[in-house]
From Swiss-Prot:
Gene Ontology MF, one: NAD binding
The organism of origin for this protein: Mastigocladus laminosus
Protein name: 4-hydroxy-tetrahydrodipicolinate reductase
Its EC number(s): 1.17.1.8
Gene coding for it: dapB
Catalytic reaction list: (S)-2,3,4,5-tetrahydrodipicolinate + NAD(+) + H2O = (2S,4S)-4-hydroxy-2,3,4,5-tetrahydrodipicolinate + NADH + H(+); (S)-2,3,4,5-tetrahydrodipicolinate + NADP(+) + H2O = (2S,4S)-4-hydroxy-2,3,4,5-tetrahydrodipicolinate + NADPH + H(+)
Principal place of residence: cytoplasm
Length: 278
């Protein structure tokens, strides 16, 4: 990297918890430079991104609520590598954010969950036509990728499985993108799980969770005090096999975020999932 210019990075959702951690990680990465910080919260407009993130030194990058001028600015810096936008915003905003970034030739790295399957298909088509890399990653934790791989291995030997995901009460969407992705991975094994032993009746709608395909149920918990946690519970006569991953601090995601920023520059289309770039 010594002979290359640094990767210009825009952090969208800069004042959020993941945005702040990303700013710190990008500033500390020798091969990256923070070029823009965007957040719609009026409390942080004009404030230095480094100050908001808790860095000791200012970044001289003010937070703005206008994404497109930042995209245009970074796209116009031709002496730099192609820009990357890291998006930790809101399910209602992320689709338009990604389309705007791709339109400017900026590579999106998306950690915001809540995109529908149809929206992901549309973004994949848009990215492919633009020959622009895009990464959508429900969970940047390498430990979570290992849990998912272990779950795939276990699914060959167990016919009953349910997923419980637990997050902080500021998370807007449920179930989590990671839980949905885990269920999809298991569904791709080509078997139907959880054949009922009896005819089930829900006394309260949703008591048995949401069906994610092939009989796999997902249960969501939202409480203050939690960050991000997931259990995949397999059952068979006489035994229970539980896989669990706990995030105790958001710094756990930063190796995955930095890896995604570097890898997205090598892509010409949309890729879904951290496991695809490890």
């Amino acid at each position: 990297m010594a002979n290359q210019t640094p990767i210009p990075v825009i952090v969208n959702g800069a004042a959020g918890k993941m945005g702040r951690e990303t700013i710190k990680a990008v500033v500390q990465a020798a091969d990256m430079t923070l070029m823009g910080a965007v957040d719609t919260n009026p409390e942080y407009q004009g404030k230095d991104a480094g100050e908001v993130a808790g860095l000791n030194e200012p970044t001289e990058v003010p937070i703005t609520d206008q994404l497109e001028p930042i995209l245009a600015y970074v796209a116009g810096e031709r002496h730099l590598q192609p820009g990357v936008m890291v998006d930790f915003t809101h399910p209602d905003a992320v689709y338009d954010n990604v389309r705007s970034a791709i339109a400017y030739g900026i590579r999106p790295v998306v950690g915001t969950t809540g995109l529908s399957s149809k929206q992901i298909e549309q973004l994949a088509d848009f990215a492919e036509k633009a020959s622009t890399g895009c990464l959508i990653i429900p969970n940047f934790s390498i430990g979570m990728v290992l849990l998912q791989q272990a779950a795939i291995a276990a699914s060959q030997y167990f016919d009953h499985v349910e997923i419980i995901e637990l997050h902080h009460n500021q998370k807007a969407d449920a179930p989590s993108g990671t839980a949905i992705q885990t269920a999809q991975m298991l569904a791709e094994m080509g078997k139907t799980f959880n054949q009922p032993a009896v005819k089930e009746t829900e006394k309260l709608p949703g008591a048995r969770g949401s069906l994610a395909g092939e009989g796999i149920r997902i249960h969501s918990v939202r409480l203050p005090g939690l960050i991000a946690h997931q259990e995949v519970i397999f059952g068979a006569p006489g035994q229970i096999y539980t896989l669990r991953h706990d995030t105790s601090d958001r710094t756990a995601y930063m190796p995955g975020v930095l890896l995604a920023i570097r890898k997205v520059l090598q892509l010409k289309s949309l890729v879904y999932g951290l496991e695809k770039i490890l």
